[in-house]
Amino acid sequence: MSLYPSLEDLKVDKVIQAQTASSANPASQAFFLNVVDSAAFPPGGNLYPKLYPELSQYMGLSLSEAEICENMPVVSGAPTQGQLVARPSSVNYMVAPVTGNDAGIRRAEIKQGIREVILCKDQDGKIGLRLKSVDNGIFVQLVQANSPASLVGLRFGDQVLQINGENCAGWSSDKAHKVLKQAFGEKITMTIRDRPFERTVTMHKDSSGHVGFIFKSGKITSIVKDSSAARNGLLTDHHICEINGQNVIGLKDAQIADILSTAGTVVTITIMPAFIFEHIIKRMAPSIMKSLMDHTIPEV
């Protein structure tokens, strides 16, 4: 079963497959040519002139043939037998004729499974990390920019399963911070589950440059009817954590809007249910989130 980063990709891929199947079946076309009066054909001789929509204008998207070929090279010609098409790491199962090889999707990808990171304290004895207890688990509340925690790829919402081999289940926030404070500074080993409360939604801007949602204080409040946001299942009462992999927590709405407007035609946002988000950031001043939170664009 094929997987797609967005509904637009699924629909366009179906159109491409149907057009390819039609052009690759001359026997079928010959049969219809024998039974249908050629005088009934529309100008240009196309048997099915409006059976499938033109890809240049589809679902509110502007898709020229050049853009399709650039984002999905396989469309321009079928691969020869045995030829492998290189695709990016863990998203290689995605079929993306519209989205293509988008860096934002790769930066925002939530990886399933558990990983281990090793970090050390800086010259001040810090690792640039704040933790929060949620439902008997320990979660990342804050990652400071250019800190050891940031350099090993920790993100807001990551779940910490172990610190130096000790299970964190049932710990309080204070105990987690105490263990980190007392840990040997040269090597701290942490076992991490990647952002279990978060999910990503990939959308495509329409001709006016919008994806179709309204937010206030970083929280999604409304979805525009028939927009890409609506088609791809974006929900209200969710907080925006990242845009194309860039953390936007603590930023003003105008700053978030600017990041959205300057993003490309494909926008992938990472969201978290509001009640969980608000619990994680509880007792953390907005000024701390704005000034200390790592808002850099991650490398891919």
Curated annotation (Swiss-Prot):
Gene Ontology CC: adherens junction; cytoplasm; cytoskeleton; cytosol; endoplasmic reticulum membrane; extracellular exosome; focal adhesion; interleukin-5 receptor complex
* InterPro entries found in the cross-reference section: APP-Binding, PDZ, PDZ_sf
List residues of the PDZ domain.
116-195, 200-274
Q: How does it assemble?
A: Monomer and homodimer. Interacts with NFASC and SDCBP2. Interacts with PTPRJ. Interacts with SDC1, SDC2, SDC3, SDC4, NRXN2, EPHA7, EPHB1, NF2 isoform 1, TGFA and IL5RA. Interacts with PDCD6IP. Forms a complex with PDCD6IP and SDC2. Interacts (via C-terminus) with TGFBR1. Binds to FZD7; this interaction is increased by inositol trisphosphate (IP3). Interacts with SMO.
Which keywords label this protein? Acetylation, Cell junction, Cell membrane, Cytoplasm, Cytoskeleton, Endoplasmic reticulum, Lipid-binding, Membrane, Nucleus, Phosphoprotein, Repeat, Secreted
Write out the residue ranges of the motif LYPX(n)L motif 2. Answer: 47-51
Give the species this sequence originates from: Rattus norvegicus (Rat)
Q: Which residues carry this modification: N-acetylserine?
A: 2
Residues carrying Phosphoserine: 6
Query: What positions carry the motif LYPX(n)L motif 3?
Result: 51-55
Its subcellular locations are: Cell junction, Focal adhesion; Cell junction, Adherens junction; Cell membrane; Endoplasmic reticulum membrane
Q: How does it sit in the membrane?
A: Peripheral membrane protein
Matching entries from CDD domains are given as: PDZ1_syntenin-like, PDZ2_syntenin-like
Q: What is this protein called?
A: Syntenin-1
Region annotation Interaction with PDCD6IP: where it falls in the sequence: 2-104
Q: What does this protein do?
A: Multifunctional adapter protein involved in diverse array of functions including trafficking of transmembrane proteins, neuro and immunomodulation, exosome biogenesis, and tumorigenesis. Positively regulates TGFB1-mediated SMAD2/3 activation and TGFB1-induced epithelial-to-mesenchymal transition (EMT) and cell migration in various cell types. May increase TGFB1 signaling by enhancing cell-surface expression of TGFR1 by preventing the interaction between TGFR1 and CAV1 and subsequent CAV1-dependent internalization and degradation of TGFR1.
One Pfam family assigned to this protein is: PDZ
Q: Give the SUPFAM superfamilies listed for this entry.
A: PDZ domain-like
Q: Name one GO molecular function term.
A: protein-containing complex binding
Annotated a 1,2-diacyl-sn-glycero-3-phospho-(1D-myo-inositol-4,5-bisphosphate) binding lies at 252-253
The GO biological-process annotations, alphabetized, read as: negative regulation of receptor internalization; negative regulation of transcription by RNA polymerase II; positive regulation of cell growth; positive regulation of cell migration; positive regulation of cell population proliferation; positive regulation of epithelial to mesenchymal transition; positive regulation of exosomal secretion; positive regulation of extracellular exosome assembly
Modification after translation is described as: Phosphorylated on tyrosine residues.
Motif LYPX(n)L motif 1 is found at 3-7
- Positions carrying Phosphotyrosine: 48
